[in-house]
A protein has these predicted regions:
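Glycine-rich, aromatic-lined ligand/substrate-binding cores of catalytic
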Residues: 862-895
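Outer-membrane beta-barrel "beta-signal"
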Residues: 631-634, 760-763, 963, 1012-1024
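Hydrophobic, well-ordered secondary-structure elements that form the walls
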Residues: 631, 657, 722, 761, ...
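Membrane-spanning beta-strand positions in outer-membrane beta-barrel proteins
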Residues: 71, 151, 220, 254-258, ...
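Transmembrane beta-strand segments that form the barrel wall of outer-membrane beta-barrel proteins
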Residues: 261, 360-366, 607-616, 767
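Surface-exposed loop/interface segments of Gram-negative outer-membrane beta-barrel transport/assembly proteins
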Residues: 177-178, 183, 189, 194, ...
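Residue-level signature of outer-membrane beta-barrel architecture
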Residues: 247-249, 349-351, 362, 385-386, ...
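Short, small/polar-rich motifs associated with maturation and membrane association
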Residues: 2-11, 15-380, 392-394, 398, ...
């Protein structure tokens, strides 16, 4: 017996030695390819087995591997899985790249996070690292072309100017059309602080974008919610979709410090409204004078008038003189190469109990014109702390300050800068012979260069946004959470006009000064109870109930004065004459009850529902409460057994559907009340007047949203998402016209119905995936059709302004113009289609030179037929490339500026003219669309389709090229990562109409806006 044991012991030892001889130890380290930081908890395993280890806090691992195994599989959440060959020396160091598809799988809704595979609604998530190097100030601009269904329009190219965002079309007449912004689960203020200071048209009329206060480098990801499945949770604020921003948090592990610096320059993205030079304009004016005299002689052949040549020689210097100092190139004088610079630092880290992320940043962006600048100072601190085994507290604090200088724009300004700059002729000199600024010109009464150097329009916006929360796990799966947030903004505006500028001239050639502020605060309290459980490993339930209170307050005031004793004493207190002073204080409140429940069976069948009840102080007690809800479901067909046989080809298939109701409350805080305004002078004393009619029947505007979705994946490399949506907006908030005998033109009420329907396509392909080379492409495409379904039941159309119409069954933004038919080749006169209608509604297509006889008709729309973007992301060893193209087809714009300087001689005596006047008609037989130029002739119609132009375009929107220095270069420096990069925006543009930028304001009306910038940026990012 003892002998048997002895033999067995010897055999066991020999077998152990044999096994040991067949194994080897593989050691190594797993890092992130992005920042060269260690990946803690990455799995390193032998293929086809469960044998493996996880990396430690430094990313290191050690694994016993049989000799027969030649490779290892390395996996980490959010990273591409890597299969690596084991080196002969047994040391395997690898870097994992982000997996775009997997990183986008988490959908953050603000009322819970869901994996993309289980989300029943319509949402797109973008990683912050894809956006951080895009060289623009505002977060919204970074989204352009990155997700289907989202349209972003710049109202101005000046730094920090407000942006307009539409998600799946325009869904309201008078209520807000902008989406709700949510930062770290809390709704925040976005857009502009309405009306600048106290609604003065000339105070900050380009409007500072509040979202420019946010440092994009602090963003972890952005989720865009487009349907009712998740948006209904936000009720009355989510009628136009939701944009959820999640900021960066600290992670467990050693502290990481990152420094980032970049700088560069910008110019106009397109050759903005090219005009004639001095000689070209003089030649055109001379021709126009001759044509005028020819027409006069033809009318009065016996009058003995001077010949056309004599007449033109006599008057040419009245309109196109040759300056003593030479012609002025106003673009060269006024426009500049703008420069920008940015400095950012962040530190993050944590342990088992505490995590933190902190950052500081400074950005300076110059505009294309002097006195157009933006400085941003931003700081952030995000902290989480575990309390015991079940509790957690946290705080997110942001502080930011914007210092902005802007030039006046558009027609609402007293002195819109670009209108003046474009219209001032080369015959006008900037300075006289003594070097002094010329005071004014016949075209505008101002010298634009002098004005931008002596006038100013300054805004300082300070924002503090803080959120604190505390949560506790009452029992397993049941969590109670309390969140309190405070969003505070104060904007201070100051203006000064020299005595000869627009406002100064209007006050009697006296300098004018103005000052104002608007203070805005929002306090939100949210208490929620959530429950999450799994039953029998098949049934998953996730439910939540919440109670929220939102309190909103504004305080604003503005005054302007004139008669200053000196141009150096510009404080309003130094001025003798008070021109105006306005002020207001407003507040509103909303109380909400929120609930949702999600259920799925075996990760195959999903159903979800939500209900929210909002009570708003902006509506009467009878209509104060609104109910908003959604139901949604999904069938994960790819998880069914009958699909497994084709899984290698059709790797995923999901069918989604949702339906629900969102709401929109009035923008006016007291829209249902009758209002009186006081402070009026009545017989030497105080007085008042009725300023708004009451409407106790005012109620919620509601959106009814249907969404159908289909998700497909082929061979785990081609991913297709196709969605159809239908959005009906009913009880539209609208200023209803009433009889002028009431003393009012309109009052706020509910009427009509608006519809948006369309489809979205997103195609994502993994073109190549390997150890050294990865290439991913994403194409997105959107088609949206907007139409008015009904107005008030009595009228089927309403003429809006000079060239828009709201008509049933047509898009909201439809032009209403006389249809231009080109130029008569024999006479050079402009032609128009008659477009009178017979009893059957057919249009008479006869052409006429009498514009007054032609009828205006609905003509084309602002809305494009197709729009989208195409992004490519390439990684090769130490190089990375990201390229985004944007495109738009089928949309149109109206050139209001053309109604001033494209009138064929009617208004151009003292204006400059567009370059396409070189293509004008000059002799019989000329075929062109630019009529004969006759100086001083009667003006044609302003509401002409001649000024309607296509916005079709393709643009290289963003390009980033980076080089990450190899590890062996950095080891001795104590640096974990160093990356050099170039980034650019709006680098190339191909447009069907190239006289101004094709990315026009959301209204479709183009008039004296600063064009967007083409930006080149060079930077370095270093991590320690």
């Amino acid at each position: 017996m003892n002998k048997s044991r002895y033999v067995f012991f010897i055999l066991a030892c020999l077998f152990g030695l044999y096994v040991q001889a067949q194994n080897r130890t593989v050691k190594g380290r797993v890092l992130s390819a992005e920042d060269k930081e260690p990946l803690i908890g990455a799995t390193v395993k032998i293929p086809g087995t469960s044998i493996g280890v996880v990396t430690d806090i430094d990313g290191n691992f050690s694994l016993e591997v049989p000799d027969k195994d030649k490779t290892l599989v390395i996996e980490f959440l959010g990273m591409s899985t890597l299969t690596a060959k084991i080196p002969a020396n047994g040391v395997l160091n690898v870097s994992l790249h982000p997996d775009t598809q997997r990183l986008d799988e988490v959908v953050v809704t603000g009322y819970g996070n869901f994996s993309k595979s289980s989300f029943t609604g319509s949402a797109n998530t973008l990683r912050g690292d894809l956006l951080k190097n895009v060289p623009v100030v505002s977060v919204e601009q970074k989204l352009q072309g990155m997700t289907p269904g989202v349209s972003i329009s710049g109202n101005s190219g000046q730094p920090g100017a407000n942006q307009s965002i539409r998600i799946r079309g325009m869904g309201s007449f008078n209520a807000s059309k902008e989406p709700l912004f949510v930062i770290d689960g809390v709704p925040v203020t976005s857009g502009s602080l309405s009306g600048g200071s106290a609604d003065a048209a000339y105070m900050n009329n380009s409007k500072t974008n509040i979202m420019s206060t946010l440092n994009p480098s602090d963003i972890e990801n952005i989720t865009v919610i487009k349907d009712a499945a998740a948006a209904s949770l936000y009720g009355s604020r989510a009628a136009n979709g939701v944009i959820l921003i999640t900021t960066k948090k600290g992670t467990k592990g050693r502290a990481k410090a990152t420094l980032k610096m970049d700088g560069g320059f910008s110019n106009a993205a397109v050759e903005f409204r090219p005009t004639l030079n001095g000689e070209q304009r003089r030649e055109l004016i001379y021709e126009g004078l001759m044509n005028f005299q020819q027409d006069e002689i033809a009318k009065n052949p016996e009058a003995g008038l001077a010949s056309p040549t004599e007449y033109a020689d006599l008057h040419i210097n009245d309109y196109a003189s040759i300056p003593e100092l030479g012609y002025t190139d106003w673009r060269k004088e006024l426009m500049r190469t703008a420069h920008h610079q940015s400095y950012e630092a962040s530190v993050s880290g944590g342990n088992d109990k505490t995590t933190f992320y902190s950052s500081l940043g400074f950005n300076r962006q110059e505009g294309l014109v002097e006195n157009s600048n933006l400085d941003r100072y931003a700081a952030r601190l995000n902290v989480t702390q575990k309390v015991g085994s079940r509790g957690e507290v946290g705080a997110n604090v942001m502080f930011s300050q914007l210092n902005q200088e802007m030039n006046e724009e558009r027609g609402s300004s007293i002195n819109p800068f670009l209108c003046v700059a474009l219209n001032t002729t080369p015959s006008f000199s900037v300075r006289d012979a003594e070097g002094n600024y010329v005071g004014s010109y016949p075209s505008s009464n101002v010298n634009p260069l002098r004005d931008i150097r002596t006038d100013y329009n300054r805004t300082r916006m300070t924002r503090m946004f803080s959120t604190g929360y505390a949560s506790i796990d009452i029992i397993k799966g049941l969590k109670l959470k309390e969140t309190l947030s405070y969003d505070y903004n104060i904007q201070k505006d100051s203006r000064y006009w020299n005595p000869l500028s627009g406002a100064g001239a209007k006050s009697g050639s006296d300098a004018q000064t103005a000052k104002g502020f608007i203070e805005y605060s929002k306090l939100i309290s949210s208490t929620s109870l959530g429950y999450n459980t799994t039953i029998a490993q098949l049934h998953h339930v996730d439910a939540l109930v919440a109670y929220e209170i939102e309190n909103y307050q504004t305080d604003k005031a503005m005054g302007d004065k004139s008669k200053l004793p000196s141009d150096y004493l510009v404080e309003p207190d130094n001025a003798a004459s008070l021109n105006s002073f306005v002020s207001s204080t407003q507040d509103s409140r909303m109380i909400s009850y929120v609930s949702r429940i999600n259920y799925d069976y075996d990760d195959r069948y999903y159903i979800a529902g939500s209900f929210r009840r909002d009570g708003s102080s902006r509506l009467s007690p009878e209509n104060r409460w609104g109910n908003f809800w959604s139901v949604s479901g999904m069938w994960n067909v790819g998880a069914e057994k009958f699909m497994q046989s084709i899984k290698s080809v059709l790797s995923d298939l999901k069918i989604r559907a949702s339906y629900g109701v969102n709401g929109n409350q009035p923008g006016a805080l007291y829209g249902y009340m009758g209002l009186y305004s006081y402070g009026q002078n009545y017989m030497g004393g105080g007085g008042s007047y009725e300023s708004a009619l009451p409407n106790p029947n005012l109620k919620w505007e509601k959106n009814y949203n249907l969404n159908l979705g289909l998700d497909l994946a082929f061979i785990n490399r081609i991913f297709v998402s196709l969605e159809y949506y239908n959005r009906d907006t009913k009880d539209l908030l609208y200023n209803r016209p009433i009889s002028s005998t009431t003393g009012f033109q309109n009052y706020l009420g509910n009427l009509g119905q608006l519809n948006n329907r369309g489809w979205e396509l997103e195609l994502r392909t993994i073109n190549f995936a390997g150890n050294n080379f990865n290439w991913t492409s994403v194409l997105n495409m959107t088609h949206n059709k907007n139409k008015i379904v009904s107005l008030d039941g009595k009228l089927d159309q309403s003429i809006e302004g000079s060239w828009f119409i709201h008509k049933v069954w047509l898009p909201y933004s439809t032009f209403y113009v006389k249809e231009y038919a080109g130029v008569d080749p024999q006479t050079g006169k402009a032609l128009y289609y008659m477009n009178t209608q017979d009893a059957n509604g057919n249009y008479d297509r006869t052409v006429t030179t009498d514009a007054s006889a032609a009828q205006a008709i609905p003509y084309k729309s602002v809305d494009p037929k197709i729009s989208g973007g195409f992004t490519n992301i390439v990684n090769y060893k130490w190089f990375d490339l990201a390229l985004t193209l944007t495109y738009s087809l089928g949309g149109y714009s109206f050139d209001k500026t053309g109604t001033y300087n494209e009138t064929d001689g009617a208004k151009e005596q003292n204006y400059n003219l567009p370059i396409y006047e070189l293509d004008r008609w000059q002799k019989p037989g000329d075929v062109t669309d630019v009529p004969r130029f006759v100086l001083g002739q009667a003006a044609g119609p302003q509401n002409s389709s001649r000024y309607v132009h296509s916005t079709d375009h393709l643009r290289v929107k963003n390009l980033t090229l980076g080089f990450t220095l190899p590890d062996q270069w950095l080891t001795k420096l104590g640096v974990s990562k160093a990356r050099l990069y170039f980034s650019g925006s709006n680098l190339l543009t191909w447009a069907k109409w190239d006289q101004y930028d094709p990315e026009v304001p959301v209204s479709g009306e183009v008039f004296c806006e600063t064009p967007p910038m083409r930006t080149y940026s060079f930077g370095i990012e270093v991590s320690f």
